[in-house]
Curated annotation (Swiss-Prot):
GO molecular function: L-threonine 3-dehydrogenase activity; zinc ion binding
GO biological process: L-threonine catabolic process to glycine
Matching Gene3D superfamilies: Medium-chain alcohol dehydrogenases, catalytic domain, NAD(P)-binding Rossmann-like Domain
UniProt-recorded name of the protein: L-threonine 3-dehydrogenase
Record text on subunit structure and interactions: Homotetramer.
Gene it is expressed from: tdh
Amino acid sequence: MKALSKLKAEEGIWMTDVPVPELGHNDLLIKIRKTAICGTDVHIYNWDEWSQKTIPVPMVVGHEYVGEVVGIGQEVKGFKIGDRVSGEGHITCGHCRNCRGGRTHLCRNTIGVGVNRPGCFAEYLVIPAFNAFKIPGNISDDLASIFDPFGNAVHTALSFDLVGEDVLVSGAGPIGIMAAAVAKHVGARNVVITDVNEYRLELARKMGITRAANVAKENLNDVMAELGMTEGFDVGLEMSGAPPAFRTMLDTMNHGGRIAMLGIPPSDMSIDWTKVIFKGLFIKGIYGREMFETWYKMAALIQSGLDLSPIITHRFSIDDFQKGFDAMRSGQSGKVILSWD
């Protein structure tokens, strides 16, 4: 079968032929329809320090997809041939304390599809049936293919009660924009998203977010005054991993504010911890999606009218995968979808 693989320990990704993966007793074989390129895939393409330490070579990559069930392991129940599915990209062990306690998203032995084991940038993918999620009929293939990053956004945004709250989202990448859109959809009062990339901020404006602020050109305190905010943000969603953005968030949070962090900062990031202490801030780390509560909420949000379509900016045939990666690497894109049909 055709597959996009990391064949060499250098920059790039290559189309190759690999065997169709073998189906285990508890697995599903999925024929891939559409995949989306994640920031993680760009890291792997660029072969940065994280990738060099993490990714085995050669390996099929990718973990954002939608497809059709074409094979079912003999011990699998609840699925049938033809089911349209996406899937949770974190494969968990099932035997650690968190897994046995129903907190599988906190599994200490998590293995990543397309990171630690073969991924979805291929004609076929095998995953445990436990990880598959049936896509409702009224959700398009395009939207289903981005459920993985959408799940990151939903998990982060819905970590706290947002109704009537003022929310700051730092980082207008696709996940940050989706998180801001979720916050607005579920009843936040003001949702402000910040970045220095004007293309991405314009995407955010198309999603109906209260205010998209280019912090290279305007002061966040001025934006708050413009919106009539007098006490600071109630909730912060840190999606950028950029130390200056996090420091600004700490400066502008109200006392008792709550922060969910999905962005990965450098290990040596320094902050003024007195702001956390004296403001009584609560900071929560976010990794992946809750299995599978986040997935049900994703589907429900779309079915209740949340429109994510503006975040999908580029579509290519898989044969034009290089154009897709070029678009992602340019910083001038939202989500990029590759069609395998």
